[in-house]
């Protein structure tokens, strides 16, 4: 059994914050928004909505494209750090009810941030293969609008809300190959919640990513017997335009490492699957994914297209 990615579907709220407009209260120049942050708009779910609502919208988009899939789902995994009801019950249980999935479906949450999608792929693949499950869904939904301090320049200009649903199963489009994981836990305070609001030490997070992510990518390449030239696209967590472009220069992959969150912001664990869904990857044979952030943790893997 080879469980891999069959398709990826997304949901991005219709309401957005204008980053140029809100940045005026700090006297931030447009050039800083364009060239450093990179996101001119930040997506926001409605005040009446919660994490499982936007997660449901993403999964329903998947089901609309695959009519008979709902009754075949055997595993539902939700990656979030901002669950409904403070996390009890787990958001995957609430989402399971909203989606009306079978009672025999295994459901659980993963409390992971920016590295969550790649870690979730590895966990879901291993879990499904060990149990002989043929169809599962990995959901990412982490609306940071629930914890953003609107008066904190360091965080208010960065994050957007979105959700994704990745269908995992047999006969996939993308096979999940070598992975690498790690954490520098003595730096966890660089990105945490304090007094119910997100607090970030941006320089520490940047230094962490700039040092550890290239090493992780090189390890995965070495373990795979590949060189960076063998990778068609490098999809990095969309922390900001500055960190994505800095890493691309260090890796020598400027033309293959897109910044694509201009119109919705840093969507945490959803940023990488958003790219998988939106970018034209038809000519790509190998894609490298690397998520990094909260923990401070990283997770890197290679996807390889299955030739039909």
Predicted stretch roles:
Residues 51-66, 209-224, 272-275:
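Short, well-ordered amphipathic alpha-helical segments that serve as non-catalytic structural scaffolds
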Residues 1-48, 150-207, 211, 215, ...:
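Condensing-enzyme catalytic core mediating Claisen C-C bond formation in acyl metabolism
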Residues 5, 51-108, 226-244:
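Conserved beta-ketoacyl condensing-enzyme motif
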Residues 39, 75-78, 97-111, 147-149, ...:
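Glycine/charged-rich beta-loop-alpha catalytic/anionic-binding loops adjacent to active sites
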Residues 79, 111, 136-142, 168, ...:
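Short beta-strand segments
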Residues 52, 56, 83-84, 89, ...:
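Claisen-condensing/thiolase-fold acyl-transfer catalytic domains that form or cleave C-C bonds
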Residues 26-33, 86-101, 135-144, 241-253:
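Acidic-glycine-rich active-site phosphate/pyrophosphate-binding loop
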Residues 129-160:
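Flexible, glycine-rich active-site loops centered on histidine and acidic residues
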């Amino acid at each position: 059994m080879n469980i891999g990615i069959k398709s990826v579907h997304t949901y991005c709220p219709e309401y957005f914050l204008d980053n140029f407009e809100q940045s005026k209260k700090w006297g931030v120049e447009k050039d800083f928004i364009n060239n450093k942050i990179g996101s001119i708009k930040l997506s926001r779910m409605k005040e009446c909505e919660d994490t499982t609502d936007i997660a449901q919208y993403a999964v329903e988009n998947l089901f609309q494209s695959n009519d008979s899939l709902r009754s075949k789902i055997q595993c539902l995994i939700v990656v979030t750090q901002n669950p409904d009801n403070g996390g009890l019950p787990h958001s995957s249980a609430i989402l399971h009810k909203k989606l009306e999935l079978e009672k025999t479906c295994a459901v659980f949450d993963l409390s992971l941030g920016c590295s969550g999608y790649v870690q979730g792929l590895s966990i879901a693949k291993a879990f499904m293969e060990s149990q002989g499950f043929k169809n599962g869904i990995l959901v990412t939904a982490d609306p940071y609008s629930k914890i953003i301090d609107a008066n904190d320049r360091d965080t208010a200009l960065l994050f957007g809300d979105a959700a994704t649903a990745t269908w995992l199963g047999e006969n996939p489009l993308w096979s999940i190959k070598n992975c690498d994981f790690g954490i520098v836990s003595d730096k966890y305070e660089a990105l945490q919640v304090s007094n119910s609001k997100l607090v970030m030490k941006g320089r520490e997070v940047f230094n962490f990513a700039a040092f550890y992510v290239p090493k992780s990518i090189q390890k995965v390449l070495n373990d795979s017997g590949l060189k960076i030239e063998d990778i068609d696209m490098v999809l990095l967590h969309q922390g900001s335009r500055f960190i994505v472009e800095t890493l691309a220069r260090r890796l020598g992959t400027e033309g293959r490492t897109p910044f694509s969150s201009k119109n919705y912001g840093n969507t945490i664990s959803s940023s990488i699957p958003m790219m998988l869904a939106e970018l034209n990857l038809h000519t790509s044979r190998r894609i490298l994914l690397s998520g990094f952030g909260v923990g401070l943790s990283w997770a890197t893997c290679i996807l390889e297209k299955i030739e039909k």
